[in-house]
């Protein structure tokens, strides 16, 4: 399952091309996304080559989904770390201290995981292009969009396996005595 995690990391790295293009257009943070893209791409390819023919069963699939969330957060944190956003000034430590480095890693992981889980919490302070580059702001929004799409894909993949259709799900979640189906009319 490590090689499949590498594939996920590799494709997630390719999504950094979008903010890289924005960085080139606006002329800011080009090296941030260039370096982040290369770091994530190399890591993804390296993980992919560890097991060229993965044997995946239900246990490995569960492990892969869990590792994919953490892998996505780690990859998503790289641009924040490279750019230095949400770092020592946010947590009030001396930039040269070990705690500042740990704090910046934690803040970057928090910002990334917040995006991929679509919670919207942030350590960036004010969220505007006056305070942060266009590319970083796009990356923040892109992680939230990817997280939202991930939940939708997960539900589309899992609900049929549980033999639950949309009407049954809605009936179980809707308040009231009974849910009536709509009848299509032409």
Region spans (language model):
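Membrane-proximal intracellular helices of multi-pass ion channels
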Residues: 1-186
């Amino acid at each position: 399952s490590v090689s499949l995690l590498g594939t996920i990391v590799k494709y997630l790295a390719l999504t950094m091309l979008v903010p890289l293009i924005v960085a080139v257009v606006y002329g800011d943070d080009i090296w941030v996304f260039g370096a982040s893209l290369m770091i994530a791409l190399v890591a993804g390819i390296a993980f992919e080559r560890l097991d060229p023919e993965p044997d995946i069963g239900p246990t490995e699939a569960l492990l892969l989904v869990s590792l994919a969330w953490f892998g996505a957060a780690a990859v998503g944190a790289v641009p924040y770390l490279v750019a230095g956003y949400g770092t020592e000034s946010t947590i009030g430590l001396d930039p040269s201290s070990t705690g500042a480095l740990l704090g910046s890693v934690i803040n970057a992981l928090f910002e990334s995981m917040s995006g991929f889980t679509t919670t919207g919490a942030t350590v960036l302070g004010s969220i505007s292009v006056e305070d942060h580059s266009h590319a970083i702001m796009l990356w923040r929004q892109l992680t939230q969009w990817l997280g939202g799409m991930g939940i939708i894909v997960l539900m589309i993949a899992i609900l049929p396996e549980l033999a639950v259709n949309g009407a049954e799900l809605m009936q179980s979640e809707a308040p009231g005595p009974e849910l009536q189906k709509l009848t299509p009319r032409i």
